[in-house]
Amino acid sequence: MRSLLVGALMAPTLALSQVVGLGTTPVGATFQLATGVAKVVSDKGGVQMRTQPMAGAAQYAPLVNKGDIDFGISNVPELHYLVKGEVIVDNRPHPDLRMVARLVPWYNGLVVKKDSPLRTLKDLKGQPVPAGFTGNPLGRVLITGYLANAGMTFDDTRQVPVPSFPRMFDAFKQQQTATSIATIGMAQLKEWESALGGVRFLQFDPSPAAAAAVTRHVPHSRVVEVKPGPGKTGVDTPTHILVYDYALWVNARVPEEVVAKVAQALHDHPAELKATSPLWAEFDTAQLGRDVGIPYHPGAVKVYQSKGLWKR
């Protein structure tokens, strides 16, 4: 975070020292991605990027919007809500957020113990499900969408209040809940494999009506079939789950040359990114400038144009 004296005189980012902050969650899959971005940008991009963990994007997006933190990371559905000031941050738009890069597809859903009798989202009726998420509203939004796929709401479950994703992870590990939000490739899946004897993703309903019910709550998402394979803990048979994109974003006033260095580092070092976490398995440099419905920062646009990746 830049000093108050510098902040009073210049645009966001410590332009002289090239030190920038990256807002992220404290644990979980988002933090895994953020640490990978920060490592590659710091090692290869000529910009020192330091992660600044907070409870969730609802906490760090206002700071990025003001320029107190330079960069942020989140999924694209959440970013849309943040920019518009809807659902996650009611009536608090964040108009100064700009895209830097589309990072990876994010395969997510709800997991249960491998030996659980629950097989589909519909089986969660009457089961203990994490709820509340006062510290990170994204959890409430996602589970609302998941349950909608099964024609249910939180009222159809036994709600177990959790304030945050870390508390949700712990509640599931302690079997205070029957399920937890999870993402293919996240570190917690391996932890649960050991502690719980295995985990398994619950099946989504892929029918058009059921898939549309999810996207009403989780925009820019889709239901897809994922087949078993290396790094896909929790997917033992072909399983329908949710997917959306993850994004790196920035304050609109961060200098173009700084954003360009970040975008260039991501483009030029895919192997280094993939080495940081299984979450990067499907990272594709050709998709860095993908249109996700949010304007891109001109510093990133220039890089993608120079690489022939900007198609609009």
Please give the residue ranges for each predicted region:
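Bacterial N-terminal signal peptides that target proteins for export
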Residues: 1-8
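N-terminal (or domain-start) structured segment
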Residues: 18-82, 87-90
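Bilobed "Venus flytrap"/periplasmic-binding protein-like clamshell domains
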Residues: 19-44, 48-50, 106-170, 174, ...
